[in-house]
Amino acid sequence: MQVLLIAFAAVAGLLNTIQTGTNATLNKSLGAPVWAAAAVGTATFLTTLFAALTVMLFAGQRPSAEAVANVPWWAWTGGVLGAVYVLATMLVADKVGAAIFMGVTITVAIVVSLTMDHFGVLGFEVHKAGLARIVGGLLMIAGLGLIAKF
């Protein structure tokens, strides 16, 4: 099961990189980042709605009113955070290139993730940042420096 989860995460990473290029091209083609972001947001909403309705219809899964009421306030901010990322792909990626853009976003994500794991914030279990994890984060930063320089 763990292998399938890791494979799915790898596919998500691949698609995330491709999405950066498609978003930047959509923005360039339309010449209006807010409209391009709205198009991406609409597609995201419709895809998610279709998936949710399919799961509800075939698996009978839906949250209870109590579950919805007990969600921490910050857990609802994912859509806003995603919108900021989409805008960044449209405004920055084609100007700095795919490798720099993805390198920065992935490296920052790794460093922040190490911190979040270490302290167990936002619902993550605690995974202490030992020496090997810290060195791994530093190597990510060094790798980004090499990509940016060459």
Regions found by a protein language model. Give the residues of each.
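Membrane-interface interhelical linkers
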Residues: 1-18, 22-29, 45-74, 96, ...
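Hydrophobic/aromatic residues within the transmembrane alpha-helices of Major Facilitator Superfamily
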Residues: 14, 46, 80, 96, ...
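Residue positions within transmembrane alpha-helices of multi-pass solute transporters
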Residues: 18, 84, 111-115
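Structural motif at transmembrane-helix junctions in multi-pass transporters
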Residues: 29-33, 88-104
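Membrane-interface alpha-helices at helix entry/exit sites of multi-pass transporters
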Residues: 33-41
